[in-house]
A protein has these predicted regions:
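Intrinsically disordered, low-complexity coil segments
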Residues: 101-109, 156-164, 238, 577-580, ...
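Extracytoplasmic
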Residues: 396, 400, 404-671
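Charged, amphipathic alpha-helical linkers/stalks
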Residues: 107, 111-156
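Membrane-inserting hydrophobic helices used for pore formation or membrane fusion
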Residues: 3-6, 10-13, 156-519
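Short amphipathic alpha-helical segments that mediate assembly, nucleic-acid/protein binding
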Residues: 5, 29-38, 59-62, 80, ...
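Membrane-inserting effector segments that mediate pore formation, membrane fusion
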Residues: 47-123
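Membrane-active, amphipathic/fusogenic segments and juxtamembrane/transmembrane anchors
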Residues: 2-52
């Protein structure tokens, strides 16, 4: 079984870098084609309801809301030390939209209903009505107490030395936090953990953000320091409740466990339905794992400044084309994973797709070649599949720093007299800045449909929200629910990989799927001058020796780099232009079963080099990459003189540890 997490692969060989000349593409005039979403196209092909769950409107809406919430948390840059409204205030309009209904009523809990409905559809399991009703009733109370908390916070912000307002705010906080704490068991009802998981993840997110509030502002509200310390961390087995640190651990491990359990169930129940398996993986990644990966940054004592995070995972849209036979609509999941999913590698940027065409007969695509580069580097590799063709046409993608992404793909598909044979006949790749590029080899026909694929839109760009202002625009946030996103100014994912499957009996590539990465993955590893910058280790550009990329555990927002004995990884980062001298502490988030010496080398823009060996302590004794298996270590300090942007090369080397160690992120902390 090739699941989304916990498998290891060797890094692909990158010796071949054969590039091919570009063939000019033209927008050939054709018939006016009907444009459909995937489910509509499948219904047209089969005259029955399709199992393509991602286009169920409930799933779409829940995924869009989750996408917007994650984007909001990624984009927030509140000053940590300032007395400001909570990060929660930015998310309230998504959790409880103003148009949903009167506050505290069942109708106002539409977002939580959508999360449950979506996970029900994806897991093929319905929540018992009594359990659903209990959860909704809990949300009614939480909303009511939350509104008291926001009001008390607004009152205090206007008069921060008023002891009565401080007292009321402390009481409102305690009531709100108690309601969340007492409700969490109702959001993980036994037997329904998976269909309630996307709702649970957002409930946990709310609880953690609320505890972050009290750690940040509790002294100003009049709490004693010992009380704040307990809200931050409490390991006493008998007294009090777990603090923020303990809850990040337990909530993370819970969400990852039930995500993996659900994915295993999809694998077992849908062996010849990769779409169902992939739907669960993609949508639950967006609704659950993406926000989970940001929870470590809620620790204000470890992240005392706003933090710039990135998601590097890849998600895939539905299979298009003909992969099965008369008995099964699709090939088995294992085969589809091998053909359609990119092998774990350093994070890549697609630069060229070359199609090898044979424009005769039924099947036209004989082969395809893709060229990739790594982040902030000309290093890369080429991946080939299939056979030679008579004609070659290319799609050229500009360099990553240009920011001209492919944000949507329209695929020309038509049905055939062969059962289950829906034939892909061409593509239109939509770019965010330049003109569309097309691949087509025959004129359109009346039986064709254009299938649009991409991911949800991000929510409105609001970096702060003042709920205290009755005229604040964020009180009326309305996400763009179009799917795929119809506005290239707020797209959430960029196209990154063209998976293609070869049917040996036809010597042609007959089925395809598209990989997409999140737009938070930056093109040049730019370090922020004022915020903590997280650079995932997979954003490196070179692996040497026994280094390889392994699948992440689900809680890290992407894959990890494992350094075996005598191996290293190099990462290129860009420092910002500055009028003053900038300094950064470099910190690793890593996993190791033994103490070991890590070699650290930094090559500066003037080619001077700083090297040192650092003793890193073991972080775990086991093999499972649970939350507590990861730990942090400050490995050094760099400064930059007053200068324009510069490139630094950071190389991490394992000289001696035979069992190897795993790197999640490299963090640059301004000092």
């Amino acid at each position: 079984m090739n699941q989304n997490y916990n498998d290891e692969y060797e890094v692909m060989e990158t010796d071949e870098r054969r590039y091919h000349p570009r063939y000019p593409l033209a927008n050939t005039p054709g018939l006016e084609l009907q444009q459909m979403r995937y489910k509509g196209w499948m219904d047209r092909c089969t005259n029955e309801e399709s199992g393509a769950l991602f286009t169920d409107i409930t799933v779409e809406d829940a995924v869009t809301i989750a996408t917007s919430i994650t984007a909001a948390v990624l984009g927030i840059s509140f000053p940590v030390g300032a007395a400001v409204t909570s990060i929660i205030s930015v998310l309230v309009p998504y959790w409880w939209p103003k148009s949903a209904g009167a506050p505290g009523t069942p109708s106002a809990q539409v977002t939580w209903e959508q999360f449950m409905n979506a996970a029900e559809n994806l897991s093929n399991k319905q929540i018992l009505e009594s359990k659903r009703s209990d959860a909704i009733a809990r949300w009614q109370g939480i909303q009511t107490l939350g509104r008291d908390y926001y009001q008390a916070q607004c009152d205090w912000l206007q008069d921060q030395n008023n002891e009565l307002k401080k007292s009321r705010l402390r009481d409102a906080f305690d009531d709100f936090e108690d309601a969340l704490k007492l409700s969490m068991p109702f959001f993980r009802a036994q037997g329904f953990e998976i269909p309630m998981l996307s709702m649970y993840a957002q409930a946990a997110n709310m609880h953690l953000l609320l505890l972050r509030d009290v750690v940040q502002n509790g002294v100003s509200w009049g709490f004693q320091q010992y009380e704040i310390d307990r809200y931050y961390s409490n390991t006493d087995p008998l007294l009090g409740n777990p603090g923020l640190i303990q809850l990040v651990e337990s909530y993370t491990d819970y969400c990852v466990h039930w995500y993996n359990t659900g994915l295993q169930q999809q694998y077992a129940n849908n062996r010849y339905n990769w779409d169902a398996f992939n739907d669960f993986r993609r949508d639950m990644t967006i609704m659950v794992l993406d926000i989970v990966s940001l929870w470590p940054t809620y620790d204000l004592r470890r992240y005392p400044k706003p933090t710039k995070s990135q998601l590097t995972r890849t998600v895939y849209t539905d299979l298009l084309g003909f992969s099965g036979d008369r008995e099964y609509l699709q090939i088995d999941i294992d085969r589809a994973e091998q053909e359609l999913v990119q092998t774990p590698n350093l994070f890549t940027w697609i630069r060229k797709i070359l199609f090898k065409l044979q424009p005769t007969g039924v099947n036209f695509v004989r082969g395809r070649s893709m060229s990739f580069t790594y982040t902030n580097s000309h290093n890369g590799y080429e991946e080939n599949k299939g056979n030679p063709g008579e004609i070659q046409e290319t799609i050229d993608i500009p360099a990553p720093y240009v920011g001209d992404d492919i944000w949507r793909i329209d695929t020309r598909v038509n049905t055939s007299s062969i059962p289950n044979a829906n034939i892909v006949r061409g593509w239109n790749f939509s770019f965010t800045k330049s003109l569309d590029q097309q691949i087509r080899w025959q004129p359109p026909s009346s039986s064709e449909t254009i299938v649009m694929q991409g991911l949800s839109c991000n929510g409105p760009s609001i970096h702060s929200c003042d709920l205290c202002d009755s005229n604040s625009p964020c009180r009326n946030i309305t996400p763009n629910y179009s799917f795929p996103c119809d506005n290239k100014s707020i797209y959430s994912h960029r196209f990154s990989y063209l998976g293609a499957g070869l049917k040996s009996d036809l010597t042609a590539l007959t089925y395809f799927s598209y990989g997409w990465t999140h737009v938070s993955a930056a093109a040049n590893n730019l370090i922020d001058a004022e915020q903590i910058t997280q650079i995932p280790a997979v954003k490196g550009y070179n692996l040497v020796g026994n280094a390889r990329v392994i699948k992440g555990p689900g809680s890290t927002g992407g894959d990890l780099v494992k350094l075996g004995e005598d191996s290293d990884v190099s990462v290129s980062v860009t420092t910002p232009a500055s009028d003053t001298t900038l300094g950064y502490t470099i910190r690793l988030r890593y996993v190791s079963k033994l103490d070991f010496y890590l070699g650290v080398s930094i090559v500066e823009p003037d080619a001077s080099e700083i090297s040192r060996n650092v003793l890193l302590p073991a972080t775990t004794s086991g093999d499972n990459l649970t939350y507590t298996a990861f730990n942090y270590y400050d490995i050094g300090f760099i400064t930059t003189i007053t200068a324009p942007q510069g490139e630094y090369i950071l190389t991490l080397t394992n000289h001696s540890l035979e069992v190897g160690f795993i790197i999640d992120k490299i963090e640059f902390i301004p000092v």
